[in-house]
């Protein structure tokens, strides 16, 4: 009800304010945090769907599995975007590709990492100061650049996402240690 309207209005006010800021370090830190959090949350939701929600492996590819994938798309406000991006049947591998490797999906891990790279590179600080940050970022960035969805699924989606979350958490702690301590 009204609490939702108030929250939505506050979110929109923040977005409007953030998008009208000077493109200085404050702006880049806001969006650096935004994309780190978005990547972490998207990865965790993908992992929960894939690893936790399905009762047993026997259900993979069945009606319950497909319904849960569609619910994941809707929960991330991405169902329509997915349908525009992919033709044919809604499959788990297409949805995994959409949320991991699709650079046009604002919720995808790849999109988030590309924006993290952009905002980190835009900070006005000496490159030596952020060398450690780049080493952590390199791991995460290369995983969304060099992989294809088949190799991720063969490796194990849960394992891939778990590694991604670990790497993004490490990156976040490196940024905190270098800039805020």
Functional labels for PLM-detected ranges:
Residues 2, 6-181:
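Alpha-helical transmembrane segments and their helix-helix packing motifs
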